[in-house]
């Protein structure tokens, strides 16, 4: 459960991320594909090379969804319901992949905003990403 402090921390750091959704999203996906190559199986039709238009576009979608989740941090299930159904029923993404991506999101934020990612903010952002992952996997049950 996200505390009020967690929510404030997430919103504060996300303000710095919000202007870079495509750039950071693409970077997070590229990191995930490199660190967890098994995740590439969900993107057989993508050009997975560095900076590809497909990775940039999908990275922007991913970070736009996270942006939407931040904007609706008090109702993550409502904000992410459609994506949860899509990933569970249509795309059939293995739930562990959300954790892999969350790890890469944390790394990207840490690289670009090291001064903002204090231990407390890091913990809050991690809790938020875990909550998002939990909601995205809720339709699997």
UniProtKB/Swiss-Prot annotation:
Keywords: Heme, Iron, Metal-binding, Oxygen transport, Transport
UniProt cross-references to Gene3D superfamilies, sorted A to Z: Globins
Iron found in the keyword field: yes
CC terms in the record's Gene Ontology section: blood microparticle; haptoglobin-hemoglobin complex; hemoglobin complex
Tissue distribution of the protein: Red blood cells.
CDD domains: Hb-alpha-like (cd08927)
Example GO BP: hydrogen peroxide catabolic process
Ranges where the Globin domain occurs: 1-141
Molecular-function annotations in GO: haptoglobin binding; heme binding; iron ion binding; organic acid binding; oxygen binding; oxygen carrier activity; peroxidase activity
Binding residues for heme b: 87
Domain of life: Eukaryota
Record-linked InterPro entries: Globin, Globin-like_sf, Globin/Proto, Hemoglobin_a-typ, Hemoglobin_oxygen_transport, Hemoglobin_pi
Binding site for O2: 58
Family that this chain belongs to: Belongs to the globin family.
Subunit architecture: Heterotetramer of two alpha chains and two beta chains.
PANTHER family: HEMOGLOBIN FAMILY MEMBER, HEMOGLOBIN SUBUNIT ALPHA
Biological role stated in the UniProt entry: Involved in oxygen transport from the lung to the various peripheral tissues. Has antimicrobial activity against B.subtilis ATCC 6633. Has antioxidant activity.
Protein name: Hemoglobin subunit alpha
Organism encoding this protein: Crocodylus siamensis
């Amino acid at each position: 459960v996200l505390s009020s402090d967690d929510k404030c921390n997430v919103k504060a750091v996300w303000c710095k991320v919000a202007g870079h959704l495509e750039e950071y999203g693409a970077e997070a996906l590229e990191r995930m594909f490199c660190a967890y190559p098994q995740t590439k199986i969900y993107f057989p039709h993508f050009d997975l090379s560095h900076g590809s238009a497909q990775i940039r576009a999908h990275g922007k979608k991913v970070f736009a969804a996270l942006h939407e989740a931040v904007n609706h941090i008090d109702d993550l299930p409502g904000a992410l319901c459609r994506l949860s159904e899509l990933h569970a029923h249509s795309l059939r993404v293995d739930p562990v992949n959300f954790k892999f991506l969350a790890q890469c999101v944390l790394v990207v934020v840490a690289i670009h905003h090291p001064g903002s990612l204090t231990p407390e903010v890091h913990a809050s952002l991690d809790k938020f990403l875990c909550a998002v992952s939990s909601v995205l996997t809720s339709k699997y049950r």
